[in-house]
Amino acid sequence: MVLLHVKRSDKDTFLFDTPAATEVDVVLREVVAIHNLRQKIGRLAAQVEGLAAHGPMKVPEQQGLDDETPLLEDYDVKDGTTKARAPPERGAHFCPDPSERRTGNAPSPELAAVLTKTVEDAKALASERQVQMKVATTQKALADAVGNIRGAVMIAYPMGLPDYDAVRQILEEREAVDGAAGLEELEIEKASLWCFNKELQREKLLSEYVGKNDKSKVMHLHRKAISKQNETTKKN
């Protein structure tokens, strides 16, 4: 077995344990899956924290608007007047969202605590601090963490979230990943592993590059379209 220290950056890093006789293609597929799951947990955690604090999202056309700003349907094109918006319903645990993206109708403190604790556990599994603690990351553990978040959301919102809520869209694999987040997502066909300034060829065995001992090897995970000189690796 060899312990791979996989890096995209100093903050985007994790340990992966695998037999030295594994094909590079198999390793790369697992590493990319772990990388993408870590990114997903980061996005999901941020949205669930917002859900716990400020409740479900507003309908898309109202996101970013306060409760008094007129909507398009409030304007009368015939006489140019504007109707006053009816005040929205406010729950017992109303907490306004400064970004005006969520309704402010937060869950009870007890349910919010369930959401927050589950997210904290998932973030800990995906954290770069796992490297410092010498804990290898597995695809199953991260997938289970996402499943736990799904369960916590179902407990807090048994009737389900709106179709347009970001939490639901992430859990249902329907999110539009773009911008900086999109750049961090990797496709297996466009990913590559580098070690000792060499790109690992997929058809070869991992042992041809790192040997068969159990020392840690630093692997750099890159998008193939990016031309970047890789740093030399270090043995622990």
Describe every region a protein language model picked out.
Residues 1-236:
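Ubiquitin system architectures
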